Structures are given as structure tokens and as C-alpha cells.
Design a protein with these regions (language model features):
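PRPP-associated nucleotide enzymes
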Residues: 1-228
């Protein structure tokens, strides 16, 4: 018995997410002149659509970053460098006085939404809908527990592992690591969870040889990209 490997193109999922948000907000896909805005606002809270504008929809990104401790054994969610702290960002969202449509690329373990949910409730912000590109069975259970309504592009009931290709390639992306006393606000300390930098601890129940193969492939791909 084997495993099914699926690849998702970000540009395709972006287009489908934007259409779904427009449908929920009951607005057209083309920008109207003069502007005719929907009654809900769109809030990307991860990397997906961050900094983008949804047609005919008030769009305001929530700038958060998954941040690992120096030991790489734990992480939490903090403001992205050079932005206000998350609580103040949410207060800004509250000032619009509009129901919110939250957007992210995937809802699986739900660490980010679990960290943000108490802050949204504290600010008394109405979450009209959560929209994700990919929803797993575990993510759906979490939304049932939080009594949140979630829409998705793709539903994967049995998702084993999720890889963000960009974060695995050295010098091209990575996961943010908090460093005490770091003075450069424009170069973020980061780590790629591949060997020899760090072991991908989220990959379990597999032959160690597979970890070496994954790491080697990522490094070779990064080299090829830099050479082109």
C-alpha cells in the first residue's frame, strides 16, 4: 500500500479563493467604478493573499508569523517584524465594524487559528466565514469545536503531511526563529527543516533514509534554481 502525493499550484488556488470570497460577499469578480464594496471585509491571516486585494471587498491582512524558539522545540505566533502586535492589529480590524472573512492556505492542525480565536472573541469581531484552500478532517473537527463556519476549495479527510516547498529550500525561504538581541529588522533569522540544518520532526513513522532523500532533493533543487 502506498501514499498519495498531491501538488497544489498557489496561483490556481489563489484565483479560486478570491472567487469564493467574492461569492460569500455577494460582489462581482471585476472591480466596479465607482466602487461598490460588499458588507464583509476579507482578512488573510497567513501567507495566502497577504498584501493582496480582493475585488469590491475591503481587504486588510493580519500580519502574523509562526516563530520558533532558538531550541526549535516549540513555537508560537507573533507579529511579523515591523508591524503592530497582534492584539492591536485586531483592534484595527474591529474599527472597520464589518463582519470578517478569514483566509488561509490550509487548515489542518489549526495552530494559528487556535492562537487567534481568543483575540477575535475578546474584540467581539464577528467571523462571517473562514475560507481555506485546503481543509483536512482534523481541521474540520477543530472548526466544529470552535463552532466556526468554514469553506474550502479542497477537502482532504486523511492528510498525513503538508510541505510548503518554499520553506524547505535554503536561502529562499524558511521558518522564522526568534533570536534574543537580533538588531537587523530586515533580515529574519530562519531555519529550513531539512538535514543538515534541522530534522523535520513533524514527519513521523518513516524510514530515516526518506528524510535524507527529501533533504537532498530540496538542496539540489535550490542549487538548480540559483544556477538558472
Amino acid at each position: 500500500r502506498g501514499e498519495l502525493v498531491l501538488s497544489f499550484d498557489r496561483s490556481v488556488t489563489y484565483g479560486k479563493l478570491i472567487k469564493k470570497v467574492c461569492d460569500i460577499n455577494e460582489v462581482g469578480y471585476d472591480i466596479k467604478v465607482p466602487r461598490q464594496l460588499g458588507k464583509n471585509m476579507c482578512v488573510p491571516y497567513g501567507a495566502t493573499l497577504n498584501g493582496a486585494l480582493v475585488p469590491n471587498t475591503v481587504t486588510k491582512s493580519l500580519h502574523t508569523e509562526k516563530t520558533f524558539t532558538p531550541s526549535l522545540m516549540d513555537f508560537d505566533f507573533r507579529k511579523f517584524p515591523n508591524y503592530m502586535d497582534i492584539r492591536n492589529q485586531i483592534k484595527v480590524l474591529s474599527s472597520f465594524r464589518k463582519p470578517v472573512i478569514l483566509i488561509d492556505d490550509i487548515l489542518h492542525k489549526g495552530h494559528r487559528i487556535k492562537a487567534l480565536d481568543p483575540l477575535f472573541r475578546e474584540a467581539d469581531i464577528e467571523i462571517k466565514q473562514i475560507v481555506v484552500a485546503i481543509l483536512s478532517g482534523q481541521g474540520k473537527e477543530l472548526m466544529d469545536i470552535q463552532e466556526r463556519d468554514v469553506e474550502y476549495i479542497y477537502f482532504l479527510p486523511n492528510l498525513k503531511n503538508w510541505f510548503n516547498e518554499n520553506s524547505l529550500y535554503p536561502f529562499m525561504g524558511g521558518d522564522y526563529v526568534y533570536r534574543e538581541g537580533s538588531s537587523d529588522e530586515y533580515i529574519l533569522p530562519s531555519i529550513n527543516f531539512i538535514l543538515p540544518y534541522a530534522s523535520p520532526g513533524f514527519v513521523r513513522n518513516t524510514d530515516p533514509e526518506n528524510i535524507y532523500t527529501l533533504s537532498e532533493t530540496c538542496i539540489k533543487n535550490a542549487i538548480r534554481i540559483f544556477e538558472t
